Swiss-Prot record:
Keyword Chaperone belongs to the record: yes
Compartmental location: Cytoplasm
Molecular-function annotations in GO: nickel cation binding
KW Chaperone (keyword) present: yes
Superkingdom, taxonomy of origin: Bacteria
Pfam families referenced in this protein's UniProt entry, alphabetically: UreF
Name of this protein: Urease accessory protein UreF 2
Gene name of the encoded protein: ureF2
Purpose of the protein: Required for maturation of urease via the functional incorporation of the urease nickel metallocenter.
Keywords: Chaperone, Cytoplasm, Nickel insertion
Xref: HAMAP family: UreF
UniProt GO cellular component terms: cytoplasm
Length: 224
């Protein structure tokens, strides 16, 4: 497969994993008036990129992709357990698990999934997003760095889609916000690539609190 097509396929919002159903706490941040306009939205997303994703989520995703790319199944299992244990709230755990399950079902139905990866997937009883993403990257011969870039882009695109549904934020304003955030997206990838997964960690208290509050939110559009 053409490498550019494979990358676009992985990053596409049409990938049937249900990412549009989740806001990762952003809906509650809007509900609590923490995010009220493009400026506060940019601060929220920028903080998530540099203080949470770049320090923990992205290095862990990259470790999944690197292990899957070379078929180091023991290492992949280890970082997978680390990822699973790091979900701070019920809905964040359910989000990752549901999207991982959808990716598992997708990959199992593809003829290009190689035998070793298929065997690993069949033995996986509790898939999650990072694991499925890494195996999709292996299947479509996407490098770990490109897979990380696709994951970061998908995350940003999803956050902007949430904003357009919860704020008075139009498509042109969302594109201006994208332009402002792209340098931070690049910085997040650079920082994540330099981070070892063993001491990696983050203390995103605001995200955890928003997620916990969202679990009890009376009226909501998103599952997280």
């Amino acid at each position: 497969m053409n490498s550019a097509w494979a990358l676009l396929r992985l990053a596409s919002p049409q990938l049937p994993i249900g990412g549009y159903s989740y806001s990762q706490g952003l809906e509650m941040a809007v509900e609590q008036s923490i995010v009220i306009d493009p400026q506060t939205a940019g601060r929220w997303i920028g903080d998530q990129l540099l203080l949470n994703l770049a320090r923990f989520e992205a290095p862990l995703l990259l470790a999944h992709c690197e292990a899957a790319a070379v078929g180091d199944w023991g290492q992949l299992l280890q970082v997978s357990e680390q990822h699973r244990a790091s979900r701070e709230t019920r809905e964040l755990h359910q989000e990752s698990r549901q999207m991982g399950y959808s990716l598992q079902q997708l990959l199992n139905g593809l003829p290009e999934l190689d035998r070793d990866a298929r065997r690993f997937l069949e033995q996986t009883t509790e898939p999650h997003l990072a694991l499925g993403w890494a195996l999709a990257a292996r299947t479509w011969r996407i490098s770990p760095q490109d897979a990380l870039a696709a994951w970061l882009w998908s995350w940003l695109e999803n956050q902007l889609a949430v904003l357009m549904k919860t704020l008075p934020l139009g498509q042109q304003a969302a594109q201006r916000l994208t332009s402002e955030l792209l340098p931070l997206l690049q910085q997040a990838q650079v920082n994540a690539s330099a981070q070892d997964t063993h001491p990696a960690g983050s203390a995103a208290f605001g995200l955890a609190l928003a997620s916990m509050a969202h679990e009890r939110q009376y009226s909501r559009l998103f599952r997280s």
